[in-house]
């Protein structure tokens, strides 16, 4: 039976540059839902269009969203996902909040008395964990009434509602943190402008989002989701923050994408948002073709790993893998995936296939360090000099 999805949609411009053309990098999302992701031809932002309207998405969150995503759960100590109702779920949830608190404490400097606001604070547990280290003044914004009340019971001054409706009067915050919310927001630039207005001039903003340069699981069947309206990269999220009047001080490209920023002092007569220009991109060479090519390779490698796990090795699979390695890839994922294939092939005594894989990486359009790493690996496996010397 088809899953219920938001039924009212709209064509969306690129949230960073306002463009409307690009390369399609996905046609579906998790649970088989129709989700069309476009990589913008101008700035390489990956975003959904057409997308659900804000009203339709709001109704979806209030109705069937939890039916679809409520069972996703959190990682246990063994790295396996524990869903709601399973043994160990509460411990996994605590571990998740602890990780968020650790990230905040590691990436920003907090002091006793600091006014800290978390947007999408849920039950307030991350803020409470931070309070165990520093005597912060904890504030939250949470649209869910039940979770907002839990946050208040935990001692967090929590506003029930959306960011755009939050009005703190004259109060300004020393730190604002936003964990895995921005990707859900219809108008991210407006939201960041709002957050800038809530910060002290010396305040910090910490944003965490899924990282499109480091996806997880199958690309269309898992990473892309109907509720993730934008898939940010280390190139595009900092540029969006710069448009909103922030100076980006740290970018952590490690699994999730973390960005730390502070309000930028504006020149006389300057207004926000700043106009888009390619100078906002720290890596302008990472254009739509660059991103789309690597997402294609990522998707292929993930599907081949799944086939290998379910059906085992075959000449056809090795041939498909070697062909895929002739295209650009995200280096970390490429190294991890190929290490898996080589290890599994060697365990089955399939030395020739393992050599094909190592040499394909060594001879492919990949970073020099990675190519040399696999060239050395091929040498240890006994590749003939003429094959190694082709690198």
Briefly describe each language-model feature range:
Residues 15-22, 234-251:
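A SAM-dependent methyltransferase catalytic signature shared across enzymes that methylate proteins
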Residues 207-242:
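Short, glycine-/aromatic-enriched active-site segment of Class I SAM-dependent methyltransferases
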Residues 189-204:
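A short glycine-rich, Lys/Arg-flanked "PGG" loop and its adjoining helix->strand segment in the class I
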Residues 1-179, 189-192, 253-257, 269-314, ...:
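Conserved N-terminal segment of class I S-adenosyl-L-methionine
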Residues 379-391:
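Alpha-helical linker/edge segments of TPR/alpha-solenoid repeat scaffolds
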């Amino acid at each position: 039976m088809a899953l219920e999805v938001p039924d009212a949609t709209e064509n969306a411009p690129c949230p960073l540059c306002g463009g409307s053309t690009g390369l399609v990098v996905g046609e579906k999302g998790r649970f088989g839902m129709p989700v069309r992701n476009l990589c913008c031809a101008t700035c390489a932002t990956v975003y959904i269009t057409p997308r659900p309207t804000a009203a339709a998405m709001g109704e979806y969150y209030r109705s069937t969203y939890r039916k679809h995503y409520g069972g996703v759960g959190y990682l246990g100590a063994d790295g396996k996902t524990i869903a709601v109702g399973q043994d160990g779920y509460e411990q996994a949830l605590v571990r998740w909040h602890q990780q968020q608190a650790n990230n905040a404490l590691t990436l920003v400097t907090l002091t006793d008395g600091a006014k800290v606001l978390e947007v999408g604070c849920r039950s307030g547990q991350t803020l409470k964990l931070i309070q165990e280290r520093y005597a912060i003044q904890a504030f939250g914004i949470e649209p869910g009434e039940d979770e907002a009340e839990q946050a208040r019971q935990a001692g967090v001054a929590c506003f029930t509602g959306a960011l755009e409706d939050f009005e703190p009067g004259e109060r300004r915050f020393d730190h604002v943190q936003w964990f895995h919310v921005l990707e859900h927001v219809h108008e991210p630039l407006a939201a960041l402008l709002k957050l800038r207005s809530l910060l002290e001039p010396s305040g910090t903003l910490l944003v965490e989002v899924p990282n499109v340069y480091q996806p997880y699981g199958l690309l269309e069947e898992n990473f892309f989701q109907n509720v993730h309206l934008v898939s940010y990269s280390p190139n595009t999220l900092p540029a969006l923050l710069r448009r909103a009047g922030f100076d980006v001080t740290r970018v952590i490209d490690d699994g999730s994408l973390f960005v730390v920023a502070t309000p930028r002092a504006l020149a006389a007569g300057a207004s926000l948002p700043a106009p888009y220009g390619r100078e906002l991109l720290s890596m302008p060479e990472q254009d739509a073709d660059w991103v789309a090519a690597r997402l294609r390779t990522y998707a292929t490698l993930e599907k081949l790993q799944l086939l290998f796990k379910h059906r085992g090795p075959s000449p056809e699979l090795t041939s498909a893998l070697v062909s895929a390695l002739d295209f650009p890839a995200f280096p970390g994922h490429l190294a991890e995936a190929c290490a898996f294939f080589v290890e599994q092939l060697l365990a089955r005594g399939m030395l020739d296939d393992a050599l094909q894989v190592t040499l394909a990486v060594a001879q492919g359009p990949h970073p020099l360090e990675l190519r040399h790493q696999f060239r050395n690996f091929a040498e240890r496996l006994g590749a003939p000099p003429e094959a190694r010397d082709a690198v």
